[in-house]
Amino acid sequence: MADLKALAESIVGLTLLEAQELKNILKDEYGIEPAAGGAVMVAAAGGDAGAAAEEEKTEFDVVLKNAGASKINVIKEVRGITGLGLKEAKDLVEAGGKIKEGVAKAEAEEIKAKLEAAGAEVELA
């Protein structure tokens, strides 16, 4: 039981970048897909229901898929967008993942445009 408590304390103490690395390890090595917010992912029964839910979405996550050839320019943009230090921004760009969470559509599109102009491959989720 003490081992589980120590494990829980270690997980709670992770930085954002360490949590991102843990997610990647669990996904790549063990095939465990994280569910957003602990929610159970269920496929929609009808195609129209999914389209309606997509239209109503007001908050978006900006996800970096690939830094591209101009990684230095992407790191500079990520630093400007997130306010992270150089090392943290570099680690985030190399690991990929969410740059910003829960932003309005206009802001998400603006961030996406900046990162794509720097050479990155970005998607809104």
Curated annotation (Swiss-Prot):
Keyword terms, alphabetized: Ribonucleoprotein, Ribosomal protein
A cellular-component GO term for this protein: cytosolic large ribosomal subunit
Keyword Translocase belongs to the record: no
Gene Ontology terms describing biological process: translation
GO molecular function annotations of the record: mRNA binding; structural constituent of ribosome
Gene3D superfamilies: 3.30.1390.10, Single helix bin (1.20.5.710)
Record Pfam families: Ribosomal_L12 (PF00542), Ribosomal_L12_N (PF16320)
Similarity comment: family membership: Belongs to the bacterial ribosomal protein bL12 family.
Cited function: Forms part of the ribosomal stalk which helps the ribosome interact with GTP-bound translation factors. Is thus essential for accurate translation.
Subunit structure: Homodimer. Part of the ribosomal stalk of the 50S ribosomal subunit. Forms a multimeric L10(L12)X complex, where L10 forms an elongated spine to which 2 to 4 L12 dimers bind in a sequential fashion. Binds GTP-bound translation factors.
HAMAP family for this protein: Ribosomal_bL12 (MF_00368)
Name of the protein: Large ribosomal subunit protein bL12
